């Protein structure tokens, strides 16, 4: 509470912003696409911690998680929390594996129950969350815990099959399976999205069908 937290100069994810507002946190902005701007802000401002969102907050974002985390830590050894939501199990390393102190994401992103958060990181931070977790409404219930454990086994397989099928569809479309499609490719808009370009201006007609 009442801390000064470094964030990317972009719209903060709504649920994250609600939590920060509830803690009366002061947001200090830096452009994570520009490492020099991070250094400048860290030198000029008294920062208590940082939140780095793994997936892009703006279409032109290009920052690398490792570089941002390393730059912040080099300026001042403050706690860094990464919001790994849509990147969990879809990237080679999540935030805590790149040097952050805590990774946070929703169990729903692993095909688990909604409203359950997952934290990975330093024991003292997780212990503090546990101490402050209100047992009357915030504790994970037994059925939720069991559902999440099942999804930890199922999700890696399901997401891997999904990624494989995405690639297969792209190759099939680019090989001319559907003559009306000129080009197809995958975009990472938090979740993977298949985009196609038609040879003619027929997109509206396709949507109407």
Tell where the protein language model's regions lie, with residue ranges.
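Conserved C-terminal alpha-helix-loop-beta "cap" of PLP-dependent enzymes
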Residues: 188-209
């Amino acid at each position: 509470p009442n801390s000064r937290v470094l964030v990317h100069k972009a719209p903060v994810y709504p649920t994250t912003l609600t939590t920060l507002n509830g803690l009366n946190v002061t947001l200090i902005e830096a452009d994570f696409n520009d490492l020099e701007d991070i250094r400048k802000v860290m030198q000029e401002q008294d920062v208590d911690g940082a939140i780095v969102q793994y997936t892009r907050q703006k279409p032109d974002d290009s920052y690398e998680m490792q570089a941002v985390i390393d730059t912040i830590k080099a300026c001042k050894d403050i706690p860094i929390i990464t919001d790994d939501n849509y990147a969990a199990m879809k990237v080679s390393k999540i935030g805590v594996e790149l040097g952050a102190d805590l990774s946070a994401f929703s169990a729903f992103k692993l095909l688990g129950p909604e409203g359950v958060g997952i934290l990975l990181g330093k024991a003292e931070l997780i212990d503090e969350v546990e101490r402050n977790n209100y047992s009357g409404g915030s504790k994970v219930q037994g059925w939720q815990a069991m559902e999440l454990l099942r999804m930890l086994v199922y999700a890696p397989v399901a997401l891997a099959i999904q990624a494989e099928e995405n690639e297969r569809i792209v190759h099939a479309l680019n090989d001319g399976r559907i003559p009306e499609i000129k080009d197809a490719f995958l975009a990472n808009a938090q979740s993977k999205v298949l985009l196609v370009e038609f040879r003619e201006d027929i997109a509206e007609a396709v949507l109407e069908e």
